[in-house]
Amino acid sequence: MFVGEKLSVEQFGPVLGKDVLLMDAAFKAKYRVEQLVYGEYDGDTIEFEAYDHHGVPPFSRFPHALLFVSRDGNRLYHQKYQYYPVFRAPSGAWFGCGPVGERDSEDRRGIAEARPMPWDSDAYHPLKPEWSSKDRRKLFASEHFRIDGDKAYCLTGSPVHELFEVKKRTVLKARGMFGGDAAKAGD
């Protein structure tokens, strides 16, 4: 698990077995490792595969992200849908914005409480044009974001080590990592 700077994310066609039907778009991603948050990795850059049922992986919309990558044999894979956009604070440390949506708020409770941050103007989430103003307000609560035009600017945030703990205790555990039971897991 690491903070990475996007170098490239390109779609590819994976080689599949005769009776295998892939329901996801496949991407090869290359990132510069800015900060290792958990695990071991010796390189300055990392390459991994990402699969997304909705098309282009959302993490690729951001220059920097906290990414959750696992090894399977000799290949590295992104843990499907698991990421946080992150931004460098004036102190130089990496932080993610406040929670996006009710589920993220629930998952973070007691682990990564968002607090006011002195963000730069590049700390925002782009808003999809098809989202209604009601959808935007529901996803980007006014205590954590300021919506201006097509951007939700961050007002609060949490450090990356706390955000890692959120995923570790929730979805990654459910997927059988960190002492969880993958047999009970679902996406």
Residue ranges and their predicted role:
Residues 64-187:
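Netrin-like (NTR/C345C) domain of secreted extracellular proteins
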